[in-house]
Swiss-Prot record:
Residues 116-123 are annotated as: Complementarity-determining-3. Disulfide bonds join C41-C115. The keyword Nuclease does not apply. Its main location: secreted. Residues 71-77 are annotated as: Complementarity-determining-2. Keywords: Adaptive immunity, Cell membrane, Disulfide bond, Immunity, Immunoglobulin, Immunoglobulin domain, Membrane, Secreted, Signal. This is Immunoglobulin lambda variable 5-39. It comes from Homo sapiens (Human).
Length: 123
């Protein structure tokens, strides 16, 4: 089987109600099957990643977005129905970013990935 890189695309940015970029994501990421991928969703200055739930979605051409997971902390997270455990969430406080980690990449993971945030005052 020939080596084929996976191209995983990300939404370049999301806008908030004030029409200022709130979240930024790299435009694309390429990785090999079997490798791991790490997607970042960086919140703008003044928005603390620690107080937000980060939601991740996957969208393939011609399909609706699929909910993958929600992550705020190790004690406040949720995996989407039927989503394999090789998809996981995390945060990097030093860069004020939410992370989507995919281990053991498969060809079926080639898709667009989107993040969204929701404020949560609960611990």
């Amino acid at each position: 089987m020939a080596w084929t890189p996976l191209l995983l695309l990300l939404l370049s940015h999301c806008t908030g109600s004030l029409s200022q970029p709130v979240l930024t994501q790299p435009t694309s990421l390429s990785a090999s099957p079997g490798a791991s991928a790490r997607f970042t969703c960086t919140l703008r200055s003044g928005i603390n990643v620690g107080t937000y739930r980060i939601y991740w979605y996957q969208q393939k051409p011609g399909s609706l977005p699929r909910y993958l997971l929600r992550y705020k902390s190790d004690s406040d997270k949720q995996q989407g129905s039927g989503v394999p455990s090789r998809f996981s969430g995390s945060k990097d406080a030093s860069t004020n970013a939410g992370l989507l980690l995919i281990s053991g990449l498969q060809s079926e993971d080639e898709a667009d990935y989107y993040c969204a945030i929701w404020y949560s005052s609960t611990s």
